[in-house]
């Protein structure tokens, strides 16, 4: 079979396939025989319909169309095998089907053209002399103290206060009512009873906590506050509102002692000393992990920057679908109504928003895989098996696709080995954490965009 290849943009190739005359004749005969067996014509038994009557009943054009569909399917498969081509996704017919019907004659050669996505050709840059800047996360002992403070707050006992005014750190129970500072009229839904106000700066509307400071139980106070411009309720966004606040109860927090009993209540450690040591180790490892991730990310992005590759649309669409699937599962775990978010109208926009991150993710994955291939980096089956065993010991009660799990673990470990190999050859400059934050990643931007709809769903539940 004669096949002419043409390289096309976006990792596509075009194929011009000439079907031999003998094939067009034999396929025509076979299709007609099959039709004769399957078509019911009154007065004739199945398979006994005379050829001429069959053609008259079905029409020459319909028979030709059936033959051409069979020819394209079979000959395309043969051409791909003959040329050693692995197609991604479904090939697209470039020839007009009507033109093929008009040109087709049994016993004469027929030529048709298709385009198809193929794996991209990747040209790596100078990967042995990379120079990158990454953020270093340094372990801060204060993180342990903050952890203790948070747990103490969670386990605090609330004790009624009668002899002083409210102060930061207290819990106030208040009734509130709001009216427009402009018209003096009450505002619907801006009122409530028994609202718990944790007296922490920055909570609720700006100025509310500060206004409550000093109030005592049963005291009533008016304060004028301005809602932020991005407040979900449009009728009060950026508007000044006069609040009438009635202090009903005031409570102080009594924090539990940091002793062995506390350690046993908040962890599986027996003593406070053991818990502190465990936390120190955890936060130290977390700092090391964050530094490693920053280095890996910088190396990967620099590797992609120096590489040349053209992504096929099939892979991009597949990655976009993967991103949306992950978002779907995350929103579901958050308790959001995913059917309200992932609507027929929303999905096209969500796919569009996810596309930049899909492209970036694909490039990073493919370039690292190409480097592993070029540098001869491998991962041992024994290491993969050990990792799988560790995972399965934690997921013993779940139905797992072992073949898929092995593939994912192998790819992850291969990428890990490749980046470790790359680190040894690269020049890496570490800067303090937060120094590079202005360079927001594509992934973060995509997550923020996809989460926007979820925020709207939750907006109605926001506190005043």
UniProtKB/Swiss-Prot annotation:
Superkingdom of this protein's organism: Bacteria
Localization per record: Cytoplasm
Record keywords, A-Z: Cell cycle, Cell division, Chaperone, Cytoplasm, Isomerase, Rotamase
InterPro entries registered for this protein in UniProt: PPIase_dom_sf, PPIase_FKBP_dom, Trig_fac, Trigger_fac_C, Trigger_fac_C_sf, Trigger_fac_ribosome-bd_bac, Trigger_fac_ribosome-bd_sf, Trigger_fact/SurA_dom_sf
Reaction catalysed by this enzyme: [protein]-peptidylproline (omega=180) = [protein]-peptidylproline (omega=0)
A GO biological process held by the record: protein unfolding
Residue span(s) of domain PPIase FKBP-type: 169-256
Isomerase recorded as keyword: yes
GO cellular component: cytoplasm
Keyword Isomerase attached: yes
Record-listed E.C. numbers: 5.2.1.8
GO molecular function, one term: protein folding chaperone
Record family assignment: Belongs to the FKBP-type PPIase family. Tig subfamily.
Function: Involved in protein export. Acts as a chaperone by maintaining the newly synthesized protein in an open conformation. Functions as a peptidyl-prolyl cis-trans isomerase.
Domain note: Consists of 3 domains; the N-terminus binds the ribosome, the middle domain has PPIase activity, while the C-terminus has intrinsic chaperone activity on its own.
Name of the protein: Trigger factor
Gene (UniProt): tig
């Amino acid at each position: 079979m004669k096949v002419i290849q043409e390289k096309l943009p976006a990792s596509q190739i075009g194929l011009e396939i000439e079907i031999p005359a003998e094939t067009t004749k034999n396929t025509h005969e076979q299709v007609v025989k099959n039709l004769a067996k399957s078509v019911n014509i009154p007065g004739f038994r199945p398979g006994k319909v005379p050829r001429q009557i069959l053609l008259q009943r079905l029409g020459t054009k319909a028979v030709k169309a059936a033959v051409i569909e069979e020819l394209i399917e079979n000959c395309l498969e043969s051409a791909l095998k003959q040329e050693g081509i692995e197609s991604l996704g479904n090939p697209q017919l470039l020839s007009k089907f009507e033109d093929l019907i008009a040109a087709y004659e049994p016993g004469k050669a027929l030529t048709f053209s298709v385009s198809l996505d193929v794996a991209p050709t990747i040209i790596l840059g100078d990967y042995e002399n990379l120079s990158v800047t990454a953020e270093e996360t340094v372990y801060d002992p204060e993180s342990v103290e903050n952890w203790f403070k948070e747990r103490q707050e969670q386990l605090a006992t609330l004790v009624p206060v009668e002899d002083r005014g409210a102060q930061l750190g207290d819990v106030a129970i208040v009734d509130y009512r709001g009216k427009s500072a402009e018209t003096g009229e009450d505002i619907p839904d801006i009122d409530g009873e028994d609202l718990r106000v944790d007296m922490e700066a920055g909570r609720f509307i700006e100025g509310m906590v500060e206004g409550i400071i000093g109030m005592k139980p049963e005291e009533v106070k008016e304060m004028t506050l301005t809602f932020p411009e991005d407040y979900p309720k449009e009728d009060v966004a950026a508007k000044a509102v006069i609040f009438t606040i009635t202090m009903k109860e005031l409570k102080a927090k009594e924090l539990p002692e940091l002793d062995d009993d506390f350690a046993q209540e908040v962890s599986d450690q027996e003593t406070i000393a053991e818990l502190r040591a465990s936390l120190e180790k955890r936060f130290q490892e977390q700092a090391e992990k964050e530094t490693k991730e920053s280095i890996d990310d910088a190396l990967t992005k620099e590797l992609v920057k120096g590489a040349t590759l053209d992504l096929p649309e099939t892979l991009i669409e597949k990655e976009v679908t993967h991103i949306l699937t992950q978002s779907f599962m995350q929103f579901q775990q958050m308790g959001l109504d995913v059917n309200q978010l992932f609507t027929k109208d929303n999905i096209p926009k969500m796919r569009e928003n996810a596309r930049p991150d899909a492209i970036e993710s694909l490039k990073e994955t493919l370039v690292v895989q190409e480097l592993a291939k070029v540098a001869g980096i491998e991962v041992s089956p024994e290491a993969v098996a050990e990792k799988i065993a560790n995972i399965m010991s934690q997921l013993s009660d779940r139905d797992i696709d072992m073949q898929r799990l092995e593939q994912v673990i192998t790819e992850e470990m291969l990428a890990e080995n490749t980046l470790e190999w790359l680190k040894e050859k690269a020049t890496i400059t570490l800067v303090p954490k937060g120094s590079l934050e202005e360079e927001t990643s594509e992934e973060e931007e995509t997550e923020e965009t996809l989460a926007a709809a979820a925020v709207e769903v939750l907006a109605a539940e926001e506190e005043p």
